[in-house]
């Protein structure tokens, strides 16, 4: 076998998980803003195996994104580098200014980011795109809009199993 053939991903696409579906997935969930942080904290209470939770409730004031991430505790970069799947979660109106930082770490490892955007059904709909949605769209390859945050733990549990 040539060196070129050895470097080609087993399943064809770079960044795709290179293991059979029977292997449990490692998932990193990052809660952004106060609402996303609450969803992430609730998810952490369920203590799901193979799921690392990070809370980034503070905003990235100026260029001090590193300080805001360090205030969240844990080792975000390590967990994102080791994860098979990366999710960011935020509620409508949350400060998601740290989403691009999470995205840069994930993309440095060729990992896609999925954004979970919680918009309650009673939230007023407007034609204008809000700042939270704009930040999530700029970071994520896939955006999932949900009206009920109880969907988030169920989805993560299914994907991690």
Positions of predicted regions on the chain:
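Glycine-rich, charge-decorated loop segments at or immediately adjacent to ligand/cofactor-binding or catalytic sites
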Residues: 116-137
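Short glycine/serine/threonine-rich phosphate/pyrophosphate-binding segments
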Residues: 36-40, 94-101
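A charged, well-structured terminal subsegment
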Residues: 142-161
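A short helix->loop->beta-strand "cap" motif at the edges of active sites that frequently abuts
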Residues: 106-113
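Short, glycine-rich nucleotide/cofactor-binding loops
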Residues: 85-97
